[in-house]
């Protein structure tokens, strides 16, 4: 895999308002279950599990799985995924991921970009970014906006992650096999 791939899934744009409504419901459920922050509580749930009755989320997961397996066709993989449901002043600052791979799906990205140390992604609805987890990145607001910035973050783990992060793995209820 090169540094990253960027895929645009038109289906998200075509059904954006319905997906936003379903993810708001999922966010409310996550909060009712005692997870106060859907981003930082990523080990406590999997957004595709919370939203499992949704046909739209099924299609997004199916496409995401295809993208990941096209890049990583062999071996055991696990995926954790969470909902970033953020206000203008709550976007993520510089960070990286301990997982082998990381990505995000732009549902309602507002006027933002994701800045990596060596490149920048213009966040557009329907974009699915996928790359190695160690690349440091942050979200930059390009202008003030009202409403929520909504993306789905995901990490893909390999056998290596399970050998290196044994303690962490047993505390992670959001990680599922990616068949």
Q: What are the residue ranges of the model-derived segments?
A:
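Short beta-strand His + acidic residue motifs that chelate non-heme Fe in jelly-roll/DSBH
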Residues: 92-95, 136-145
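Non-heme Fe(II)/2-oxoglutarate
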Residues: 1-74, 91, 177-178
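A short beta-strand-loop-beta hairpin characteristic of the jelly-roll/cupin
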Residues: 107-124, 140
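A short glycine-rich, His/Asp/Glu-containing loop-to-beta-strand
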Residues: 70-85
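A short hydrophobic beta-strand segment most commonly corresponding to one strand
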Residues: 102-105, 145-162
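Short, cationic low-complexity segments
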Residues: 171-179
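Conserved metal-binding segment of the jelly-roll/cupin
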Residues: 122-138
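Short, conserved beta-strand element in jelly-roll/cupin
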Residues: 85-86, 96-112, 155
């Amino acid at each position: 895999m090169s540094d990253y791939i960027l895929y645009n899934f038109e289906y998200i744009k075509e059904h954006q308002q319905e997906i936003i409504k379903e993810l708001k419901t999922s966010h409310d459920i996550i909060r009712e279950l005692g997870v106060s922050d859907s981003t930082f509580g990523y080990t406590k749930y999997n957004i595709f599990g919370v939203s499992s009755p949704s046909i739209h989320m099924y299609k997004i997961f199916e496409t995401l799985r295809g993208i990941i397996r096209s890049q990583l066709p062999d071996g055991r993989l696990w995926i954790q995924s969470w909902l970033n449901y953020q206000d203008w002043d709550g976007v993520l600052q510089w960070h990286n991921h301990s997982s082998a791979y990381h990505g995000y799906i732009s549902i309602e990205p507002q006027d933002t970009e994701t800045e990596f140390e060596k490149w920048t992604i213009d966040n557009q609805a329907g974009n699915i970014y996928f790359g190695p987890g160690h690349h440091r990145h942050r979200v930059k607001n390009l202008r003030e906006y009202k409403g929520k910035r909504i993306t789905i973050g995901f990490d893909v783990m390999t056998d290596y992650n399970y050998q290196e992060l044994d303690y962490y793995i047993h505390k992670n209820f959001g990680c599922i096999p990616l068949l």
